[in-house]
């Protein structure tokens, strides 16, 4: 009991000492030193370097008087090792004082060093300094650690400490110390404790170190950094199973090595050599997944490998089989001057410096295309050879890395994403070179973003990759063909991408023209609203719809400005309408009404749209207008003018009644123009001539710009009318129906039937239309009669004779004022028409089929004869006159 109590008492102070701070330990050291000075040193050398046994908690019963009585004897037995003061002496005092009194000599670092020197041979356990904790770890008995053997002194050292060891012990050596970053060196060596079965005892560790030193004692001290680079790249994922193979010719010999590598000291060869050696290493590894991160540098292509000028040069060479790779490298690494010139394969332009033909590929970017085309001696034309060369390169790419083409597929359609993710694990286990991952990652984004703007080098790729359909892509994880083609073009496209060839040759890194793109992403619960666009909630649906509509409207509006003559004339007409309204004198009230009438001429299409804006004005002219004209022609004079102009413009090539009606309402003008342009072309031949003429006249009344636009339309319509024998139509149909809306060409047929009822107050417009018809636009036989009726204005019999076919002889219906205004405007129009129709006298007659009358068609704006708009009519007359004057210029 006494010995046990004494041990317990001694254990408690040790525990307290461990808990005490550094200051307490220092004080204890000082006190212990004083005690040692007072007492003679113990006869035997102390082995305090052994860590004390784990302390035991003191029990209250152990501290009784019995323990105190036997403590002296216990100290006597243990005194040789630990001269600890008796707890009785320290009764009532804090344990810190007892710790100071019972300072353990082995605690001091200096004493430890001395004891190591004296008893290093006999030590069982090595004491470790706290300063060395980063080197040895927190718990060396259980930590995994790695050792290297110094070839100078055969000492086993941890890699983290190797540099300092070399500097300390062998700094006098002529060779410079080999600096090894701890992380990279650490990866060289598998844990010895694990490889030896995970033993935790120090003796086992030292013995394993001995094995290491024995196996690598013949190794040289220093390895070239390149050798070390390869070590780092290829030996990272080491496994204890392969311990038996320990290579001998290296300084930092890893305890485990996967495969022996014969490094080439040549800088360029080193990088390329890593390519072939990697595949074997990786395939033999148990955990190939670790490989990719461990080989960042070796994947960099050597300059020779980039000779082909491909955007992503390295992948083809690195991804080939080792044998193939070595052969390819030999060819690529040949200097340009050493190649044998072949005009069918090489650029062939004579180099001014060397006086020899250039031996770069046909896609050489040093010499211009014209220079390369001028080279003599090719078996085929240069362009043919270039196309063949590109095709061959693409085929090679397809054969070389079909796997790397697959990843792009999922990128285009996320549904295949699961196959893609499952694919990646496959690739590594099957020995795919880690270096592959880089090239093929770099090339991934390009194929899957055909919708994105591509760099100038990729137009051909875009054309090739865009057609690929996403469905085949995700049908199976490995469809090589669809996906491979774009990717192969990425790396082999040498047409447009070759401008970068020169700069690429100087780069030692892969690059991509796009921002990084995810290989795949989760689309669970999402809706696809476009290629690559997925929506995960519906909160923004309304906003998205509104935005889409706005964009569509904007694009459609812009479209009209860019469309060729037909649409352009339509738009000018609409613009002119406001001008005429403003400028038409009061005497030309009829002119403004004409616009309304024109609006009604396209009643079939426009009736609904036009009626709403201009319905108010109809009642004033209701008596003059037929029932239909009342509805559609009731529109305001301005609107009617616009509609008239639109109808005339639409009539030029393809504007049917629908087109003419569009202008009636400002909102509807653009859509009508679109419709008219579409419809006009099909029916131009038959009835367009009349419509075109009307449109041209009305547009001429408007701004000069409109006149220009209308002139092409008029010409077109006139030609179509002549072809369709518009002259016959114009004479009969116009006189019978007085088609108010001569503008719509295909409606012209309809106008003939409906024009009689359509006659409206727009006498002036009718007169203008009649003139247009005379100029060679026969009355529109095919246009809807209802629209013509609405557009037509009451015109005198004389007016109707004027190729105002759309306007039926309803002059009697029209009020006297409107009739007078019409005649007034008609006279100047006739004069103007005569001027314009210098070349075609037949234009005066309704039957004129020539295109010149079309220009006269601009006059129709004057046709608005509705009495209500007398105020606006004066301006309209002025516009009519001006338009007539300008029409000759507008002729195409």
From Swiss-Prot:
What's a GO cellular component annotated to this UniProt protein?
nuclear matrix
**Domain SCA7 spans what residues?**
334-401
Q: Does the keyword Cytoplasm apply?
A: yes
Q: Where is this cross-link: Glycyl lysine isopeptide (Lys-Gly) (interchain with G-Cter in SUMO2)?
A: 257
Biased composition, class Pro residues, residue ranges: 39-55, 405-419, 448-458, 468-483
Q: Where is the cross-link described as Glycyl lysine isopeptide (Lys-Gly) (interchain with G-Cter in SUMO)?
A: 257
Q: Where is this site: Cleavage?
A: 266-267, 344-345
Q: How does it assemble?
A: Component of the SAGA transcription coactivator-HAT complex, at least composed of SUPT3H, GCN5L2, TAF5L, TAF6L, SUPT7L, TADA3L, TAD1L, TAF10, TAF12, TRRAP, TAF9 and ATXN7. The STAGA core complex is associated with a subcomplex required for histone deubiquitination composed of ATXN7L3, ENY2 and USP22. Interacts with SORBS1, PSMC1 and CRX. Interacts with TRRAP, GCN5L2 and TAF10. Interacts with alpha tubulin.
Q: Which PANTHER family match?
A: ATAXIN 7 RELATED (PTHR15117), ATAXIN-7 (PTHR15117:SF2)
Official protein name in the record: Ataxin-7
Species of origin: Homo sapiens (Human)
User: What is the gene called?
Assistant: ATXN7
């Amino acid at each position: 009991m006494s010995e046990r109590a004494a041990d317990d008492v001694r254990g408690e102070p040790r525990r307290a000492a461990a808990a005490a701070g550094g200051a307490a330990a220092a004080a204890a050291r000082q006190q212990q030193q004083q005690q040692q000075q007072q007492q003679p040193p113990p006869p035997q050398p102390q082995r305090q370097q052994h860590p004390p046994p784990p302390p035991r908690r003191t029990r209250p019963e152990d501290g009784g008087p019995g323990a105190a009585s036997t403590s002296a004897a216990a100290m006597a037995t243990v005194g040789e090792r630990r001269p600890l003061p008796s707890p009785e002496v320290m009764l009532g005092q804090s344990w810190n004082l007892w710790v100071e009194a019972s300072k353990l000599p082995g605690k001091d670092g200096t004493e430890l060093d001395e004891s190591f020197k004296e008893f290093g041979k006999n030590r069982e356990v090595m004491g470790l300094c706290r300063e060395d904790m980063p080197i040895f770890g927190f718990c060396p008995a259980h930590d995994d650690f790695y050792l290297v053997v110094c070839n100078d002194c055969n000492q086993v050292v941890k890699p983290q400490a190797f540099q300092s060891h070399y500097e300390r012990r062998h700094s006098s050596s002529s060779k410079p110390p080999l600096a090894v970053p701890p992380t990279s060196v650490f990866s060289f060596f598998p844990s010895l404790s694990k490889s030896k079965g995970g033993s935790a005892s120090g003796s086992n560790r030292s013995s394993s170190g001995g094995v290491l030193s024995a196996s690598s004692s013949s190794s040289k001290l220093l390895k070239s950094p390149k050798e070390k680079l390869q070590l780092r790249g290829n030996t990272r994922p080491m496994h204890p199973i392969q311990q038996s193979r320990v290579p001998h010719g290296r300084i930092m010999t890893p305890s485990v090595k996967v495969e022996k590598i014969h490094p080439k000291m040549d800088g360029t060869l080193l990088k390329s050599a890593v390519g072939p050696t990697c595949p074997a290493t990786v395939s033999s590894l148990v955990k190939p997944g670790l490989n990719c991160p461990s080989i960042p540098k070796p994947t960099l292509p050597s300059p020779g490998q980039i000779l082909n000028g491909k955007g992503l040069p390295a992948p083809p060479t690195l991804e080939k089989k080792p044998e193939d790779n070595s052969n390819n490298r030999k060819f690529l690494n040949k200097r340009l001057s050493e190649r044998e010139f072949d005009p069918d394969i090489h650029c062939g332009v004579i180099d001014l410096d060397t006086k020899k033909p250039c031996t770069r590929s046909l896609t050489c970017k040093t010499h211009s295309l014209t220079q390369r085309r001028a080279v003599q001696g090719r078996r085929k034309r240069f362009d043919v050879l270039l196309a063949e060369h590109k095709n061959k390169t693409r085929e090679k790419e397809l054969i070389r890395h079909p796997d790397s083409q697959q990843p792009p597929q999922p990128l285009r359609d996320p549904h295949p994403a699961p196959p893609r993710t499952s694919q990646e694990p496959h690739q590594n286990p099957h020995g795919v070179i880690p270096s592959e991952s880089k090239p093929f990652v770099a090339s991934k984004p390009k194929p899957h973003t055909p919708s994105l703007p591509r760099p100038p080098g990729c137009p051909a790729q875009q054309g090739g990759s865009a057609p690929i359909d996403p469905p085949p892509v995700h049908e199976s994880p490995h469809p090589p063909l669809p996906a491979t083609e774009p990717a192969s073009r990425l790396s082999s496209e040498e047409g447009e991408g070759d401008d970068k060839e020169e700069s690429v040759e100087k780069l030692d890194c892969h690059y991509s023209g796009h921002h990084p793109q995810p290989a795949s992403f989760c689309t669970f619960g999402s809706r696809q609203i476009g290629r690559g666009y997925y929506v995960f909630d519906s909160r923004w649906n309304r906003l998205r719809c509104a935005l889409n509509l706005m964009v569509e409207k904007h694009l459609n509006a812009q479209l009209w400005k860019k469309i060729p003559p037909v649409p352009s004339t339509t738009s000018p007409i609409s613009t002119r309408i406001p001008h005429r309204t403003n400028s038409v004198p009061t005497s030309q009230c009829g002119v403004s009404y004409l616009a309304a009438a024109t609006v009604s001429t396209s009643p079939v299409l426009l009736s609904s749209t036009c009626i709403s804006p201009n319905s108010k004005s109809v009642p004033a002219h209701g008596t003059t207008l037929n029932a239909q004209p009342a509805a559609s022609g009731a529109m305001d004079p301005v609107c009617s003018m616009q509609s008239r102009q639109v109808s005339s413009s639409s009539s030029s090539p393809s504007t049917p009644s629908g087109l003419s009606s569009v202008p009636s309402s400002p909102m509807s003008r653009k859509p009508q123009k679109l419709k008219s342009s579409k419809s006009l072309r099909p029916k131009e031949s038959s009835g367009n001539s009349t419509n075109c003429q009307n449109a041209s006249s009305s547009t001429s009344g408007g701004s000069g710009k409109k006149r220009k636009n209308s002139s092409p339309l008029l010409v077109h319509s006139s030609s179509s009318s002549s072809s369709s024998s518009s002259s016959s139509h114009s004479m009969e149909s116009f006189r019978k129906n007085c088609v108010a809306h001569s503008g719509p060409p295909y409606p012209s047929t309809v106008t003939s039937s409906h024009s009689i009822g359509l006659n409206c107050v727009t006498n002036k417009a009718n007169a203008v239309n009649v003139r247009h018809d005379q100029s060679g636009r026969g009355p529109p036989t095919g246009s809807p009669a209802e629209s013509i009726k609405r557009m037509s204005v009451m015109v005198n019999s004389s007016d109707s004779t004027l190729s105002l076919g759309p306007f039926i002889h309803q002059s009697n219906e029209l009020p006297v004022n409107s009739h007078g205004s019409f005649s007034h405007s008609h006279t100047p129009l006739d004069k103007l028409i005569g001027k314009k129709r210098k070349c075609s006298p037949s234009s005066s007659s309704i039957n004129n089929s020539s295109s010149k009358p079309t220009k006269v068609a601009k006059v129709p704006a004057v046709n608005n004869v509705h009495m209500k708009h007398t105020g606006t009519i004066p301006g309209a007359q002025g516009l009519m006159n001006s338009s007539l004057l300008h029409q000759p210029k507008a002729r195409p």
